[in-house]
Amino acid sequence: MTEKEKMLAHQWYDANFDKDLETERVRAKDLCFDFNQTRPSDDSRRQAILTELFGYTLENVAINSPFDTDYGWNVKLGKNVFVNSNCYFMDGGGITIGNDVFIGPSCGFYTAHHPLTPKERNAGLELAQPITIGNNIWFGGNVVVTPGVTIGDGSVIAAGSVVTKDVPPNSLVAGVPAKVIREINENDAPKN
């Protein structure tokens, strides 16, 4: 089994010293660099770079620069997704984002675990677990989502939260570590 196959099977793998994975990360970093150097008004060039990075054509997805990801091909973005500036997708474990999702500035989606023991950590071992984001979700700025987390449809993650556990649908979540504050319901709709 290759290190990439181990990564995709959510097993411990060599993240630092495997040449094939390193080559794929360098490819993604080069594409992110190119994307981040384009003018915001050059939409056709920016979309072409993102299509090459992710491996598919995006549907009404806006990503502000700077943006960074480890591989790109392991990120699945739904329709009508907005990613604000300075976001990082550590996508070794896979990141799936549903439709109609707003991601505030400086958010991080981290799929990698490292060993607690220094010998194994220094050997480059890593365990990647998926992050799954449902539909109609809003992330405030500076949110961190950790490996293996699923966030249910209709939820709001308050700015500065660190999400370490699954979030039920229609939940307002805040804090470090993030906790469910309450359920979101029709009474939360703006009134004139």
From Swiss-Prot:
Domain of life assignment: Bacteria
Which organism encodes this protein? Staphylococcus haemolyticus (strain JCSC1435)
Answer yes or no on keyword ATP-binding: no
A GO MF annotation of the entry reads: acetyltransferase activity
**Signal sequence region:** none
Its EC number(s)? 2.3.1.-
Q: Which UniProt keywords apply?
A: Acyltransferase, Repeat, Transferase
**By what name is this protein known?**
Putative acetyltransferase SH0499
UniProt xrefs under Pfam families: Hexapep_2 (PF14602), Mac (PF12464)
